[in-house]
Structure formats: C-alpha cells, structure tokens
Amino acid sequence: MDQLITPAIWCDAAADEAARFYADVFREGSVIEQVLGYAATVSIHGFQLSLINGGDQDAPNPSISCILNFDPLLFGGEDQARAYLDELYERLSGGGVLMELGEYPFSPRYAWVRDRFGMTWQLMLTDPAGEPRPFILPSFMFGGTNHANAEEATEAWIALFDDAHRGALRRYEEGGPMEVGTVMFTDFTLRGTWMAAMDSGAFHDFTFTPGVSMIVSCRDQEEIDRYWTGLSAVPEAERCGWCVDRWGVSWQVIPHNIAELMADAATREKILHMGKIDLTRL
C-alpha cells in the first residue's frame, strides 16, 4: 500500500548527505528519489522519509521523533533485535543522547538519541506478545505551550483522516510525573500509517516547528480542500501547500504528482505563490 503521509525533515543544506547517511545506516535503507540540491526521499525498512533542503532556521527538535520498534518478531528473535538496536544506537547518536541506553519501566532496552542532522530517534525493544506494529512510527510529544493536548489533537486527526483509528491509550495515574489522565502514550493510524503521541513527562521549552513536517499526498483537489480545511489554523503560515494546525504541527498538503508539477518551471512558479495548492490554476 502506498504511504500517504510522510514525515519530512528540514535539513540545513544537507538533504543529499542525510539521504546517503540514512541509506547506509539502516540495514534496509535506500535512496528512492532525489533532486540534487533540493530534496530526497529515502526508504527505511519500507517506510518513506523525506528530506528537504533549507536554512538553519527550522532545525528538527524532539517534539517530533521516530520510534524504532525492535520487535523480536521483526528481526528473527530477541538477540537479533537487541543487536540491531545497539548497532543503530551507536550510529544514530552522533548529535547527542537524550535518554541513555538501558532498561526502563516501559522497555527492557531503550534509548532516545539525536543524529548529526538533528533528527531524534527512540530505539525501543518491545514485547513480541503485544499488538504488532511497524518498525517506524512518527511520534508527537506535546510539551511547553502544547502540554496536555495529545488526546485532543489525536482525536481531531483521527476524525479528519481516512483509514484512521486509535490503538493503545495509556494515561498518567496518581503518583506519576504529570496530571492524572493526561496521555502517557497512545498510538493510532492516519491514512493507514501508524503514529504515536504523548504528553511530555517533563518541562520542555520547545514545541512543534517546520523542522519536521508531515506530507499529506492527495489524489485530487477535493482531497486537498478537505485536508487543508481540517488542518490549516494559522493563515500567515500558509505557503506553497504548507500549513500549520492549531497545535503548531506543520503539514504539507500536496498533490500526489508534486514532483512532476514542480519539474515545470512555469507551474513551479505558480505553486510558489500559492497558499493552498489550487490544481485548476496550474
């Protein structure tokens, strides 16, 4: 099945280098699309990740990370899953370690790291007896001005997108670090893509930025209109198919053939001057 929502990492003039890095670091990694100097798409164990060249004003931060699910069933057993987790811990931690590799109440082996391009990754050994999940899940952390909004936001997204439903939902209880009832962890699908969210268990002074955005691939103008109406909440942020929702998450609502459209200079110039993309004007 085609991946209809794709995370996009804003790179400081390093998209080509980042694409080669991810293709090399992961055992099943490859560059599947590339416009040198502008953007690239990599496949990581079948999951697509987009890389966009830009400046340094919107670096990724941990508000949107990717969970790497080391389910022993995906890797031929627990020993193999642990070995691959440890391998990626070494290779993906070039930008620093947010949570040290070790045992935690929610996982026997876990770490949260930042790679040298600023993207953060949560490496987690999971229980093979649990509900199956894919290897990669984009994860939203609601902190700062967005604290305690995880449930509200995910409910709204699930209501908006097709092929969407909630999976697990675990809340903070008495004696925990956050208010009772706020979201400790939840996962859900949007257009068939598994994602996760949580209310931050500690104070952070960062929140969502365009450093990591979500690309929504649309088949026609009707889909563009529907998702744009449901997502865009900051008029001044509307540009070239980009919009920002009321929690500050950046979305790119674009036609499925955007690469083809942007290859034509006249069409590209029109798109660059649009907010919401209007196919009837191209």
Predicted regions and their residues:
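Structural motif
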Residues: L4, A39, S63-S65, G96, ...
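Generic structural signal for secondary-structure transition and capping sites
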Residues: V31, F47, G94-L98, E236, ...
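Conserved beta-strand and immediately adjacent loop positions that scaffold enzyme active sites
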Residues: T6, A39, R109-Y110, L137, ...
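N-terminal beta-strand motif that seeds the catalytic metal site of vicinal oxygen chelate
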Residues: M1-R20, V25-V35, E100, Q122-G175, ...
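N-terminal basic, Ser/Thr-rich segments that initiate or prime the first beta/alpha elements at protein or domain
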Residues: D115
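Conserved short beta-strand elements that form part of the metal-binding/catalytic scaffold
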Residues: G29-S63, W121-L123, R171-F206, W251-H256
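Vicinal oxygen chelate
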Residues: C11, A15-D16, D24, C66-W112, ...
